[in-house]
């Protein structure tokens, strides 16, 4: 209760301060972005849809009735009326335009999202909170040169390996899992053949690690980072989304659980998406305190979760100067603002360029 009161107070203070700063000059503040070229790839951006325009997407009633639903529509810059009129595909158009407007981010990986799979190896719509099919993301990303396709395949599907092969043929750059809402146990030996095929195809796995609070409910025990020991030991290149920030497993902080894994497995990386959210205060500082993470960090935004009150430079005045917070808050482009905030908090340029270097060299 005390923490909630403190967060509400912090948000209120930032609202007042932001109103004052809204009167200030709204410059682009390119000097906050120390990159000579537009080369950064964002490896972690979500889309969603309601099936408009025959997208095949859906959000179940539980999630649509959740308070988060309206916030997510707002964060994606859309509305029910617009989706119905333009189709779900309008979200891709908006993302592409925003990335094109960025001074430093060149491309964004758009994540498909598979659902829960039943005992027959088929999609369980009743258990699935959100579904974004591979085919839809593939077709839409083909239309925009600055959007990259990421597949999502629940390995419990009866045709999971066939889907993986197809995803590779269609140019997917990785496979995305959120085990805690897809009900995948990454440590389940049953899915070893799927992992072996991933290695054969050189297909990386981007898997959520740590507590999940973006959905109506989640089985957080499935996002224990140590469950990734199995794919890592088999040679799968794994990107631990959010570097297991937040949550505990077996009485230990998830972040502490992943640190020895970084030393143990050279094929383990962590993405820096969501690290500046209000529920993760201090985690950038924690990351910087561990030299073993240097050279293992990959840039991601967790778009659309970049909006106030989830993220603000004013939450991080222990790591930013007031002048830096003012300058960052003036940046209009979401991607540029995200990069500037993370740079300002101490993350070095390598964390923003490693992903595209590895992707280009096929090391991912």
Feature locations, PLM:
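An N-terminally biased module of ancient metal coordination in phosphate/nucleic-acid-related enzymes
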Residues: 22-111, 117-128, 338, 349-351, ...
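Active-site gating/metal-coordination segments in enzymes
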Residues: 114-220, 284
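Hydrophobic faces of well-ordered beta-strands that scaffold small-molecule active sites
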Residues: 41-45, 108-110, 149-151, 175-177, ...
